[in-house]
Every structure is written in C-alpha cells, then in structure tokens.
C-alpha cells in the first residue's frame, strides 16, 4: 500500500484528507508540523508527501527542501498561497506539484497518483503474502482457486496488518487507521474483527495468521 505523509497545522484538513485517502487505499500519516514530520520519518518510510506552506516553526518551503534532499521523496504543496512568487519558490524548493486551497480532494488524489506514476511507485490494488492474495479493488482474498469477499473494515484491517508482517499494532493504532480519529465505540470491536478474520483465513487454508501479542496488540505471521 502507498504510504502518504500529510503535513498541515489544521487538524480538520488532516482528518479530511486522511479519510479520503483511506477510501482510495492509500495509507495516510498525518503530522501538524514540519518538525513532527521529520521525527516520524526517522522510523517510518513514506512514498509521497502532501505539505502546507504556512506552518509555525519550519515552513513548507524548508520542509520540502529537506524531504527532497534527505529522503528523495515526491512532494505536493497544498496551500492557500496562490501568488506566482510563492509557486516559484515552491518549485525551486523541489516540489513536484502545487495545489491551492480551497481544493477538491478528488483532484488532489488524481495528482497524488499522477506524481506516483512519474516516480514509478507502485499503487496497484493487489498484494500477495505467502499463498494469500489480497485485492483492494474487490475486497477479495484468494488462495489457489478459493476466493472470499470481505466486509470493508475487515479487509482494511487485514491489509494494514499484512503490509507490515511481524509489526505489532495496538488496538488504538488500528482504530485510528481503520475507524478514524473520531470513533467513539468500544475498542473491543477490533477483537471481534480479528476473530472473524482468523476464521476466514483458516477456512481458506492461508499461510498467513494473525497473532496476539499479550499486552501489546496484534501482528501477522506468514508460515511458509
């Protein structure tokens, strides 16, 4: 799954973009400042960044320059500043595209995909781990000639775990990514979804299993 870093000091914009990226099967990592974004990148790989210009501390121009020079990842500027001089400075800083606010989120996603294609970054809808193939477009699991369609949340949860084998995810991390920041339900819903996924994987005879890490969360293991 494509990993997209979104940096903006407006939490509403962060949540808005993240929710739409999620529906497009793009994993969003949101940060409120340039400094926080760089701290995240010390431990998390991303494929592309969407960043604001006007932020406290490190501004978008500085952040863009650092992302290009130190991490060599594509950047899209998303900003209310529409002066030609700002656009010139942004492209000098290394941005690959420039989108002004207010913006259409669908257009932003089109531009993200276009930049990814330019960099030959894979945003295909399928991934295979062990003997299991996951198809995001159809929410399907396949092992040999057996195919199973999952409910949306179950598929998103399994796909998130499968993209990072052996990485432990807490319930809080899972809820934030799959159900969103404003989810107010019981966190035990994660356990219910995990139980169902285990049953489905067993029925398919998948080599992938979901393991419980006591006191921490869940991870996937591939038994080949």
UniProtKB/Swiss-Prot annotation:
Pfam family, one: Response_reg
Chief location bin: cytoplasm
Domain named Response regulatory: residues: 3-116
Purpose: Member of the two-component regulatory system HssS/HssR involved in intracellular heme homeostasis and tempering of staphylococcal virulence. Phosphorylated HssR binds to a direct repeat sequence within hrtAB promoter and activates the expression of hrtAB, an efflux pump, in response to extracellular heme, hemin, hemoglobin or blood.
Entry's localization field: Cytoplasm
DNA-binding region: 124-222
Description of post-translational modifications: Phosphorylated by HssS.
Name of the protein this chain belongs to: Heme response regulator HssR
Gene Ontology CC: cytosol; protein-DNA complex
Gene designation per UniProt: hssR
Source organism: Staphylococcus aureus (strain bovine RF122 / ET3-1)
SUPFAM superfamilies: CheY-like
Family annotation (InterPro entries): CheY-like_superfamily, OmpR/PhoB-type_DNA-bd, Sig_transdc_resp-reg_receiver, WalR-like, WH-like_DNA-bd_sf
Keywords from the named record: Activator, Cytoplasm, DNA-binding, Phosphoprotein, Transcription, Transcription regulation, Two-component regulatory system, Virulence
